[in-house]
Amino acid sequence: MLLMVCVRLCLLSFLGGVLAHPFVPGPAARPHSLDRASKKREYSTTGCSSEKEVAITAPTKNIFQSLTDREYVQVTEFLHQQKELNLTAVVNSTSWDNVIVTLDLLQPNKTDALTYLEGYGPVPARYARATLQFNSQLQPYIQEYVVGPLPIKNGLTRYEELNYIFTSGHGRTKVYNADGEAIATFNLKVGTEIKDITKRLLNGTATGADDDNLLIAGSDPLIHSGDRIYQWNEFYSAHSGEFFSETILPSSLQFKVDITGRDPSKWEVVGWYYDGQYWPTTAAFRKGVKTLTRRPGPNLDGSWTSTDQQGGKLPRDQLYPPISVQPDGPRFGVDREQNYIEWMDFSFFISNHKETGLQLHDIRYKGERLIYEFGLQEALAHYASQDPLHASSAYLDTSYGIGTSQWNLVDGFDCPSHATYLNTTFYISETTHVHPNSICLFEYDAGYPIQRHLTSTYVSATKNIVFTVRSVSTVGNYDYLFEYSFHYDGSITVTVRASGYIQGAFWSGDGDYGFHIHDNLSGSMHDHVINFKLDLDIKGRKNSLLKTEFVPISQVYPWSDGQSINTMKVNRSYISNEDDSKITWAKNGVAAYAVVNKDKLNKFGEAPGYHIFPNSGSTAHLTVQSSSALGQSANWANHNLYALQHHDTEPKSAYAFNSHDPHHPAVDFAKFFNGESLDQEDIVLYFNLGMHHLPNTADLPNTVTTTAVSSMMIAPQNYFPGDLSRRTIHQARLTYNEKSIVTDKKTFGTKQPTCAYDMNKSAPDLSTFVGEIEIPKFPWNPSGSLQTNPGG
């Protein structure tokens, strides 16, 4: 049995030479043509629609998307030519070699970008951001470099350390798990030494043998105590069927390892835990096992972990459910080369990145910029438990890769069958990976009107059509659905939904940390906190943060005959500086916040802006205060909303490798706050989505997206002269007389399709699922592309 089957708990990553994938390897890789990597449906023009994609041309280059294939090759070769770096090709490397971890575009400075986007300057010079890991020493470390300008030119291109975007002052992070394979081997050695006990307690073994039925997974992040490095590990039952359910099959048997240094002969087991009891040594554990009065046994796989249909079928469920169609074809345009999209009067660019996945840029309405940048920064899952492994677990998911975890979307299920699909590409370990059809674009009818009103003589209603950009990232046991939606009224929502297997803990009779949800399974409590950056530019870069608050008052009015009237009023104030901008949502939702421009009042004297507020589901910040596991690595998680003055030296609230040294992170969000003014400055918002998740029986086998959802909306506030949704023709007004007979019907030019619709167009295409396409970059082999299963 493979040690690291589908369990994100395992800290071993590609940095240590072992990649913990949420899937077993697929079949042997086969040659693949990129020609069919992106799904573009086209049908005959008979019937309602040709479904032909609307191709458009972006007004400018997409200066935000990652490196081109040629740039990846050039930068890789350039770095290998720098003898002082002493790099080894990844395909030939060991855990003691220096390697290239990843390459991406170093995002342009905002001033340079806006100068180009507004037509006043040249395209910003392109620079690569190179993440290198130096393993050829006793203390391995990651160092970020900047390489450029691109393309590579002899005598012009240079490389240097990338330090200015890190609050620590340097882009260097110590790595304590570089010897991932050695750690895995050590843990299997421990499993072998106590296999007599695991057979007795768990009826299984984890020794590295083919007939193992247990596996071992470790806590993340590693535990730093003084100058020592520790990790808790737990034995899990291996799945016995088709479903990778290990994270709900804990055994409670855990051991703590001191893995300080790089010499495995000096590593040692320094503690054992089982079913609420602790022993400081293996000898004490062996002795204590003999006197155990309770031996509950492990959680075992079975039909309860299956996600297939089971149980009695629902009434009338044999009938095909409603579906959405686009009878006249897509109503949005796409420039695939530039990843540029237009829908109604919205336009924007998208980019995709290994750590953070989908990002939106230069979002405009009728050509006027609303948002410079909008995208995920980090996703945290922080656990709590009476057992040491879960008490030590706080996952920062960009370290695993939100972008690397975006896979082919399931047509008709992840997205409507009429959706348009885009590919994503990223670079890791000297190979580019193409994930076909991993972003989808589509319109849908929300099923309720965006506007409606009825009177004694008429009723009016307007369709609520929404345009959505969606991706799904499977990070270990959890699947995150990320989507950005655009609305007729000029508002934008970002939504995160979660599904997949929970990470359960062993039930030892204590309900303080979760419900008892299966035989020996506790629904281990945890917080999901998902951080986003939102850089609004309201009629320019100079903005302020307005707070409006409903407050109860008792007031005497000229008309109240001297009596106090108990009522309420609105208080307006501005958040004047960064130190006052760490915001927790007000009780009862009485306070609201908006980015406004005080220098460009509308004709009524009000400051135009966009306000931000929770939309659906729950929002959350971290419950734990001064987390022992996180140290200073996730200070962005402590409140709901933040406002900061923009600086090119502070491009992100988080860093993908903060979890390697959480008490000394390269990016400490708390250091962004230094009292700077927020009065008519270039303001950047950071906000958190998420939920406090206390899993119950409804989370088995998988959590469902109906309850695991969090959403934020930004909407115009005194920005436009009225409701923008009045511009759509897809509305109706019915006038009726005193006898309630309709005398007039206004449909404002809407033409109802009357053609026959071919239902085959709406049938999900489930035969084209592609895992990923890998293209080696060093040595460069453009004809050596391979198609593999996800994680294969």
Pin down the residues of each PLM region.
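Extended effector regions of multi-domain proteins
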Residues: 21-217, 224-225, 236-491, 501-510, ...
